[in-house]
Amino acid sequence: MKKKRKIFGKIILITLIVLIVAAIAFSLFVYASLDKTVDINLLKRRDSSITRIFYYDFTDRKNRIGDAVELEDEAIFQSRSEWKSIYDLPQSLKNAFVAIEDKRFYDHKGVDWLRTAKATMNYLFRFDKGGYGGSTITQQLIKNVTGDNEVTPKRKLEEIFRAKNVEKFLGKNQILEAYLNVVYMSEGCYGVGAAAKLYFNKDVSELSLVECASLASIVQNPSKYDPFTHPENNKQRRKLVLKEMLDQQMIGEDEYNRSIDEEIILSEKIEENKSSGVFSWYTEALISDVCRDFAEKYNVKPEVARNLILKGGYDIYSLIDPRLQKEAEKVYHSYQAYIQNQNGTYPQSSCVILDPKTSDVLALVGGVGTKKGNLLFNRAISAKRPPGSVIKPLSVYSVGLEEGIFNYSTVFDDTPLEMEDGSLWPKNSPDRYRGLVPLCYALEHSINTVAVKALRHVGLDKSYDFLQKYGITLNEKDKCDASLALGQLTNGESLLNITNAYCAFANGGSMSKAKTYLYLTDSNGQILIKKDDEEKRILSRENAYIMTMMLKGVVDDGTASFINLKNSISTAGKTGTSSNNEDKWFVGYTPYYVCGVWTGYDTPTPLYYTKNPSCILFDKIMERAHVGLDLSNDFEEPFEILERDFCFDSGMLVGDNCNEDLRGSRALKGYFTYDNMPIELCNRHKSVYIDAYDGMILENPLLFWRKRRASLLEYTRNVPDEIHIEDSDYLIESRKRM
């Protein structure tokens, strides 16, 4: 019996030890997973209620040499935010908030354990359905700054550790000052300084005891205790505040009796704009970028970051070019002259201008017409639309060049592919098939069949990986011909990202991420965020130049040949159209700028134009952008580039037979590198004698006087008879007599 008891005791002991170890391990795991810190800089005083925006008057943008100039018209401010020193706040106000929100504020180290215990019991057993109410002023300050209001055990534990850490670095006066300046006071108002002006039209230092109690009443539920909208609720709550102040010996019986039934006189409610007015498209994108980066770096919610930035006290050093922004806006104000659809309606449009060497966003317009509000849908950065053929240089042509799979003159057969179900795909736009064409020509005329065939040489994985290097957002479903060769991306892509990717072509194969600003500083000049200027190389300088020459062909002789800018300065670019003609794109560049334009309806609807409207807008914008610049500037050709004449139909070096083609000389000039160029003469053109009357090949030309020498193509293809291939008449097989 004793032996059994000993064994049983050992089992219990071992079980307890295991449970204790498990509990400790679990506690350590939970502790390690908690975010226990909050950036102290977020809690410190902001001397200004204005966030200023600067631009740079660069003499050398690439090396960041230039002076910062304030954009006074773009200053950001909230009229209902005003930082007040703790020494400017009346004692009654400080006492009122402490009495009702955290009566042991001056005694605890960030956490009131008694209130926390009560709140925990309430959370577990729901004694009070109205809430849990265990947060100290320090904890509330952290919630106000981080925006983390989740009611979960994990969030509460994080809040506790954060509060204790804050109290290690800040004194009680600093904490109370920060809290009273950031706490939400209803009506879009933050802090007691702005609240005193709003509700009583007074400086906070002039507030009476009952007015102080009224402000302290708002905090628990701003919408419920708003003095303007719910004066009776506020009155009942401020009586409770005064009673707490009496019980905590912050006021005497006489003060309490005088104040308990005293009415407050509210100022007339004025509907104010919370900002300086309507921001430009650029400024709004800038604010969005700064807030996103701020939220990420300082671990706060995006809406909290936005509140902090809009409340003021920061300096943003933007990368805008005010002249270009103004010129782009002028074009979009006059949009009706450029983009009327054939059905008489006007679609939407957006544009982005980048510096190719730095990827600085110089100008940005998110919609047509005059911008009439804030937080509007910005189509330049937020619209995700299928890019169509604009993607081909990124996903196919540049990949094949860089990997040495093909070159400028590599020839593909422009014929449709037969799919498993017997259908022919893809179709070209317009619906024609030209036959043998070199890559440069296929890109100039946006030939879909060649893009798909070239992609299959490159491989889906390689194409997908390169697009990610370019910064294009992809879905696993995009590993298919339609997405990678024809631009029908599952989730679409933004104009900004597509335009940014083209910087790699314009900048010798390297690019950095597009950015609207360089620095965010506080009002004392301390840098809070610094944007990365680091470049990544995607293509060699030589292949980037070859891509530029191919894209220059698009503007000189291809789908964008009606662009007039090319007559003034070297211009390269690519058109794009999504399925059903629902999106029209053009991304182009000169030695100075990269500009992307998108046109379409917010709800995808077919577009009907004889000329791509995005090309027209690009032309108008870039014509204005280049005023005053040296237009003789050209794309810089690397020393290693070789220029050679090649045969259009074979991609090989031009031979004598290439000049006897019935269509005339088939020689084109191409751009190559030493290790990726044609080295043999054309062997596809064969010299034959044909009947001068009907053009058929003569088997025995010595016996036939009506003859002429010509070069025909030795090439065999298998396509359905109903498909007309334009170069079929120039194949040897088609000229043989039956």
Where are these regions (language model features)?
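Mid-domain, small-residue-enriched loop/turn segments at the edges of structured enzyme/sensor domains
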Residues: 424-428, 459-500, 513
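Short, well-structured active-site flanking segments
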Residues: 106-116, 190-193, 252-255, 377, ...
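Juxtamembrane regions of bacterial inner-membrane/periplasmic proteins
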Residues: 2-333, 337, 361-362
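Active-site SXXK
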Residues: 95-98, 245, 328, 359, ...
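A penicillin-recognizing enzyme superfamily signal
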Residues: 15, 318-341, 351-353, 364, ...
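Short active-site loop at a secondary-structure junction
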Residues: 81-86, 347-348, 373-394, 408-411, ...
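Low-complexity, Gly/Ser/Thr/Pro-rich intrinsically disordered linker/tail segments
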Residues: 644-738
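Conserved catalytic neighborhood of penicillin-recognizing serine enzymes
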Residues: 125-151, 272-275, 406-463, 522-553
